[in-house]
A protein has these predicted regions:
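FAD-dinucleotide binding site
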Residues: 1-243
Length: 243
């Protein structure tokens, strides 16, 4: 089948669908191809019976994510506060404990160690331009070391390193040795601070979306009708002429 369109968008996640929206608003014809049998990319609503769903991907929003909130409002998707009441559970160093508030009850010396490292991290993050992190002073050096390497050099205890690792794993879904220091600094600055990234109320996990986050992609895709093709794998683009 042959069909003409000004722009072919590959992937029907939020980025692809938002690109299609903006291109359409600019007067361009668009076709969106998605290899999966659904739209949404890394946001997924999984049915678990009785009309209920579990969110299997990205599901939170918080301060600094103004465009996401604006998109939800435009699509008529309400938000609600993430449940953050009661006692919290921490399994650390082979022990399980509960606590209230923002700070767990562990060795004060360990908390001080974490606090010093986090203060240094926040100071470094403020020096990395959120809109162009590669232009930061010593960007190559910062990108050439993992967050794990930096933590080892800036903490005195293994317990402090484990706590900081928990924060990285929660935010990035990756191990400290799998992300560069520059990326952590950029991400922290973009999100307000490293502390804000891991917080609930006032932080990146502050709100959730009624009906599940995948509703955002589903409603946005519905605006394009048949121009969004699921189960349609992109193979390649032939070069027909030299520019």
């Amino acid at each position: 089948m042959s069909e003409a369109a000004d722009v072919l968008v590959v992937g029907a996640g939020l980025a692809g669908l938002a690109a299609a929206r903006d291109l359409t608003a600019a007067g361009r014809s668009v076709v969106v191809l998605e290899a999966r049998d659904r739209v949404g990319g890394r946001i997924v609503n999984e049915a678990i019976g009785d009309g209920k769903i579990a969110e299997m991907g990205g599901q939170w929003a918080g301060p600094t994510q103004d465009r996401l909130y604006a998109l939800a409002e435009n699509l008529g998707v309400a938000t609600f506060p993430t449940y953050d009441t009661g006692r919290k559970v921490l399994h650390f160093n082979g022990r399980r404990g509960t606590y209230t508030g923002a700070i767990p009850r562990i060795n004060p010396l360990v908390l001080a160690d974490v606090g010093r490292a986090q203060a240094r991290l926040e100071a470094l993050a403020r020096k990395v331009p959120a809109d162009a992190p590669w232009t930061a002073a010593r960007a190559t050096q910062l990108d050439g070391q993992t967050f794990q390497t930096w933590v080892r050099r800036n903490t005195a205890s293994s317990s402090a390193r484990k706590l900081l690792a928990l924060g990285i794993e929660a935010v990035f879904a990756a191990e400290p040795g799998d992300v560069s220091l520059l990326h952590v600094l950029f991400y922290s600055h973009s999100g307000g601070s490293f502390q804000q990234l891991i917080d609930t109320t006032g932080g990146a996990q502050q709100d959730r979306f009624a009906g599940g986050s995948a509703v955002l992609a589903e409603r946005l895709a519905a605006r394009f009708g048949d121009a969004v093709r699921v189960c349609d794998t992109f193979v390649g683009v032939p070069q027909l002429c030299r520019l």
